[in-house]
């Protein structure tokens, strides 16, 4: 009889852990974090630049929100790292699939406008970043288009520009980018991302280019986001490109071209005469 009472079911109160709701949330969050770290034992929680861009809200990007009717837009992205106090040189988006696409559909075109968004990951580093874009399609260095932009290393910035030259598929290795770091307070690598947005203007040969319209400018000093709050970067790329591409075709004056500024565009493209006048045989 005693054994029956001992093993019989009881209607008494069930004992539970008196953990509060907030404490339970903290426990669940800690457990989820441990699971994520254990799932990636090699990285120990470190993120690749693609993963970091996703966390920061920089990916994915779509041109669906960009209202541009006169131009066909092509996009590409490049990731690179550069040692502090060093110079890195690479070509602009030399991916053959990306570069070949506009040249396949539009045999004759020029780069009318492009936007470049430079995203620096080293938020607390001091020093300057100098970015040069050089078109080495010409044999004579005096004819090469060269643009130079200087900005603090820990800043994000966007640049719009226009090149007056025709491009061919063979020119894909002639658009060079040189990035240098000066006066940096770091010794390790500075990882960055460059997003290129090309505006393709379709033309027919022979057509003279309006070289007077060739200009490179920093369209807007971007806000100094707090890098400790990832939510601040929500739709960052979309907002930047929408302002850049949408406002570039209506803006007439560029106060950023003031040479007295410490940062910004410090060197403009040289005005290159595309169609030189023919000399008469009687001269």
Curated annotation (Swiss-Prot):
Pfam families: Tenui_NS4. GO terms for biological process: transport of virus in host, cell to cell. The keyword Iron does not apply. GO terms for molecular function: RNA binding. Keywords: RNA-binding, Transport, Viral movement protein. It comes from the Viruses. The keyword Transcription regulation does not apply. Transports viral genome to neighboring plant cells directly through plasmosdesmata, without any budding. The movement protein allows efficient cell to cell propagation, by bypassing the host cell wall barrier. Belongs to the tenuiviruses pc4 protein family. This is Movement protein.
């Amino acid at each position: 009889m005693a054994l029956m009472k001992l093993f019989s079911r009881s209607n008494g109160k069930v004992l539970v852990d008196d953990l509060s709701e907030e404490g339970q949330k903290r426990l669940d969050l800690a457990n989820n974090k441990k699971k994520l770290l254990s799932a990636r034992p090699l990285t120990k929680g470190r993120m690749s630049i693609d993963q970091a861009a996703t966390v920061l809200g920089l990916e994915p990007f779509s041109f669906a929100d960009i209202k541009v009717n006169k131009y066909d837009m092509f996009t590409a992205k490049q990731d690179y790292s550069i040692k502090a106090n060093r110079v890195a040189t690479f070509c602009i988006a030399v991916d053959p699939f990306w570069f070949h696409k506009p040249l396949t559909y539009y045999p004759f075109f020029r780069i009318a406008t492009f936007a470049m968004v430079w995203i620096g990951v080293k938020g607390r580093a001091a020093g300057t970043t100098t970015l040069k874009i050089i078109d080495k399609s010409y044999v004579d260095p005096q004819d090469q288009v060269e643009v130079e932009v200087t900005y603090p290393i820990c800043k994000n910035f966007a640049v719009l520009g226009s090149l007056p030259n025709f491009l061919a598929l063979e020119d894909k290795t002639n658009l060079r980018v040189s990035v240098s770091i000066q006066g940096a307070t770091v010794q390790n690598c500075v990882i960055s991302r460059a997003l290129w947005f090309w505006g393709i203007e379709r033309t027919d040969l022979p057509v003279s280019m309006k070289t007077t319209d060739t200009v490179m400018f920093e369209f807007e000093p971007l806000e100094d986001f707090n890098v400790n709050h990832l939510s601040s970067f929500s739709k960052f790329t979309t907002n930047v490109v929408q302002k850049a591409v949408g406002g570039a075709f209506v803006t007439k004056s560029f106060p950023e071209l003031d040479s007295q500024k410490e940062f910004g565009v410090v060197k403009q493209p040289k005005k290159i005469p595309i169609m030189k006048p023919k000399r008469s045989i009687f001269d």
